[in-house]
Every structure is written in C-alpha cells, then in structure tokens.
C-alpha cells in the first residue's frame, strides 16, 4: 500500500482534531459541522470548533441555567433564547477573561473571527429553519484598526548596515560565522 501524501496526512490530522473538538461541544453541532463540511476548509472548521467551544464555555459559566450542565449536553434551545445583547456581552467578555487560572485577551481580529464562527453557526440553523431568529446579524463586526508600520529612519538604517558589515558585538562563534559569510558574499 502506498504511503499517504503530506496533504492526506494533514487532512487526516485535521479530521481527528475536529472529531476531538466535536466531542467537547454540544451534540447538536454535529449537524452544523456536517453541513459546512464541503463549503469550508478543514482548518477553518477546526478554528470554528475552537471558537464555538469558547462561546459555550462562556454560556456555561455565565448562564445559571447551564451552570451544572456539561457543555456536551447543552441543548439547541439555547440559540433561540439568546439575543443580540447577549452576543455583545460575549464579545465584551472576549476582550479579557480568565480560563484555568490564566488571563486571556483577544484583539479585534480574534474577536471578529470568533463572531464569524457564531455567525456561521447561527446562519446554518436559521437557513435550515431550525431556529426562527438570528440575533448575530444585529451585531456589528468589530472594526479592525490598521497597525502602524514601524520603519527605521535613515540614521538607524546606516547604523544597522554598519553593525552587519563590521560584525561588532558578536560572540566568538557568531564572529566566526560572520567572517566566513563576509568572505563568501
């Protein structure tokens, strides 16, 4: 039997990882993942599963109705009971929260991605008429602020080039490599 290609191996790893994540998610999400299987990449499905796990952990921790419920046993009815304000509270929670004693923070891009996972899930159930309302459509996507490009000024560029050429402030081993590369180049 021929060995599997790299892509086949990676695909199989993704399938196993997705199955592992699905076992930690509410049972009703199996239909959702089956529904998006052919329209999304395996890594996207894994990212969605991870983000939805965070969402359902939030539901479990903040909703008294689900405090003593295992995430796997949360029912589909939760989607109908949530409104746009609940989703906005979740997005606010994502900015900074504690999990397993560690403080976690998400920037605008991460929050937007997590909201995209929720949008996709709600869209699937709404499109298939399993839920009547889709409160996520009422929530605006976070604005992504452009990162400022940090550039070296002319003086800093000159200093950098001088250090590279001269090999100053290098360890003995680095200096030996520098000398060899200098001769080669």
Task: Show which residues each predicted segment covers.
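Short, charged, amphipathic alpha-helices and their helix-cap/turn boundaries
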Residues: 154-163
């Amino acid at each position: 039997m021929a060995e599997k290609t790299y892509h086949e191996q990676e695909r199989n790893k993704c399938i196993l990882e997705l199955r592992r994540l699905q076992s930690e998610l509410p049972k009703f999400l199996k239909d959702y993942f089956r529904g998006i299987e052919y329209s999304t990449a395996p890594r996207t499905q894994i990212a969605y599963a991870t983000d939805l796990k965070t969402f359902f952990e939030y539901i479990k921790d903040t909703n008294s109705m689900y405090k003593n419920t295992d995430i796997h046993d949360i029912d589909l009815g939760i989607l109908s009971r949530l409104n746009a304000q609940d989703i906005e509270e979740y997005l606010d929670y994502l900015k900074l929260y504690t999990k397993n004693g560690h403080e976690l923070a998400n920037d605008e891009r991460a929050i937007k991605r997590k909201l995209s996972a929720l949008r996709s899930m709600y869209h699937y159930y709404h499109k298939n008429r399993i839920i009547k309302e889709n409160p996520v459509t009422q929530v605006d996507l976070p604005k992504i602020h452009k990162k400022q490009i940090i550039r070296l000024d002319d003086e800093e560029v000159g200093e950098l080039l001088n250090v590279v050429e001269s090999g100053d402030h290098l360890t003995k081993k680095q200096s030996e490599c520098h000398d060899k590369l200098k001769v080669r180049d």
